[in-house]
Design a protein with these regions (language model features):
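A residue-level structural signature of the nucleotidyltransferase/glycosyltransferase Rossmann-like core
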Residues: 5, 44-45, 131-132
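Charged phosphate-binding loop/patch that engages nucleotide di/tri-phosphates or the phosphate backbone
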Residues: 148-171
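Short loop segments at secondary-structure junctions
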Residues: 11, 40-43, 51, 113-118, ...
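Unchanged
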Residues: 66-151
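A glycine-rich, hydrophobic loop/mini-helix early in the fold
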Residues: 33-64
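A short, polar/proline- and glycine-enriched secondary-structure boundary/capping micro-motif
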Residues: 26-28, 56-61, 132
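Acidic, metal-coordinating catalytic segment for phosphate/diphosphate chemistry
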Residues: 1-35, 39-41
């Protein structure tokens, strides 16, 4: 089944055009990718491991992905989190941490406080094959061992101080 994404301009305005997933982006066209750091309030971050068949095989990451055509950023992150972990969250529960842009993509980085037992996580076949709650020090060890997807490692290092502050606050 073909999947389409909305096309944005560099200033994040919708253009009204659609992009077929898996095809090259044209100059001046941008998609939207969303990511979420799920934290438990006890100093841990939820990570999932990519299956061997995917790029960055066997590395750990946070949940996220591309927004589908017609989705808002919040709709996309709620869908991605549920698809990849089985965790349901209302759009109002997500907190926007940061936004970014590269050559063809706008990024929205969210966080969500949720203390979900690992046994309740439902992994998405073909996407992820393991899950863990990782402390900040463990995440740093995984980064040093190159066991966290490099893009995700960069995100974590940029957003670490904010994530640490959030761990110390009550809902």
């Amino acid at each position: 089944m073909e999947e389409f994404n909305d096309v944005y301009d560099k200033d994040r305005n919708l253009t009204g055009r659609l992009h077929l997933r898996g095809t090259p982006w044209k100059p001046g066209e941008y998609g939207l990718v969303v990511c979420v750091w799920v934290y438990d309030g006890k100093g841990n971050i939820l990570l999932t491991r990519r299956v061997p068949e995917k790029s960055f095989a066997g590395t750990w990451e946070n949940s996220g992905g591309a927004a589908k055509a017609g989705e808002t950023s919040l709709q996309a992150i709620a869908r991605e989190l549920f698809e990849e972990t089985g965790i349901r969250a209302g759009e109002e529960e997500f907190q926007l941490l940061d936004r970014g842009r590269d050559s063809f993509t706008h990024y929205d980085y969210y966080c969500l406080k949720r203390d979900t037992p690992l046994g309740d996580i439902v992994l998405l076949p073909g996407e992820t094959d393991d899950v863990q709650w990782a402390s900040f020090s463990k995440i740093h060890r995984l980064i040093a061992q190159k066991k966290i997807c490099r893009v995700i490692a960069g995100q974590f290092l940029r957003q670490e101080q904010t994530l640490r502050r959030l761990q110390d606050t009550k809902p």
